[in-house]
Amino acid sequence: MATLPPTAHTSQQPVNIEDEDGILDEYDQYSLAQSYVVGGGRKGRTKREAAANTNRPSPGGHERKLLTKFQNSERKKAWR
């Protein structure tokens, strides 16, 4: 079995963005420096806006489903 060669760096230290000037071009530095990388996919809304505008489960259950079934049955009775 072949063994892997030892790595050159024994301790991994986080590299600062300014230290990587030779490695990264200006577009890479811009994309790493911007805060939009951290945000989540929330349709452009804040957590508060998303919580205020979501469909919450009804404590009564399937009220809309029962109502539409009742309305459709009444409509069928009136049609006959």
Swiss-Prot record:
Subcellular localization: Nucleus; Cytoplasm; Cytoplasm, Perinuclear region
Annotated GO MF terms: acetyltransferase activator activity; chromatin binding; DNA binding; transcription coactivator activity
Keyword Nucleus annotated: yes
Post-translational changes noted in the entry: Phosphorylated. Phosphorylation promotes DNA-binding activity. Acetylated.
Pfam families: Phospho_p8
Keyword terms of this UniProt record: Cytoplasm, Nucleus
Tissue spec: Strongly activated in pancreatic acinar cells during the acute phase of pancreatitis, in developing pancreas and during pancreatic regeneration.
Record-level GO cellular component terms: cytoplasm; intercellular bridge; nucleoplasm; nucleus; perinuclear region of cytoplasm; protein-DNA complex
Span(s) of short sequence motif Nuclear localization signal: 64-80
Region Disordered, annotated ranges: 40-80
Family annotation (InterPro entries): NUPR1-like
Compositionally skewed regions (Basic and acidic residues) per UniProt: 61-80
Keyword presence, Cytoplasm: yes
Induction: Increased by methamphetamine. Up-regulated by cyclosporin A. Induced by energy nd amino acid deprivation.
GO biological process: acute inflammatory response; fibroblast apoptotic process; fibroblast proliferation; intrinsic apoptotic signaling pathway in response to DNA damage by p53 class mediator; male gonad development; negative regulation of apoptotic process; negative regulation of autophagosome assembly; negative regulation of autophagy
Subunit annotation: Monomer. Directly interacts with MSL1 and binds MORF4L1, two components of histone acetyltransferase complex; the interaction with MORF4L1 may be mediated by MSL1. Interacts with EP300; this interaction enhances the effect of EP300 on PAX2 transcription factor activity. Interacts with PAXIP1; this interaction prevents PAXIP1 inhibition of PAX2 transcription factor activity. Interacts with COPS5; this interaction allows COPS5-dependent CDKN1B nuclear to cytoplasm translocation. Interacts with RNF2. Interacts with FOXO3; this interaction represses FOXO3 transactivation.
Purpose: Transcription regulator that converts stress signals into a program of gene expression that empowers cells with resistance to the stress induced by a change in their microenvironment. Thereby participates in the regulation of many processes namely cell-cycle, apoptosis, autophagy and DNA repair responses. Controls cell cycle progression and protects cells from genotoxic stress induced by doxorubicin through the complex formation with TP53 and EP300 that binds CDKN1A promoter leading to transcriptional induction of CDKN1A.
Family statement drawn from the similarity comment of this UniProt entry: Belongs to the NUPR family.
This protein's name: Nuclear protein 1
Organism: Rattus norvegicus
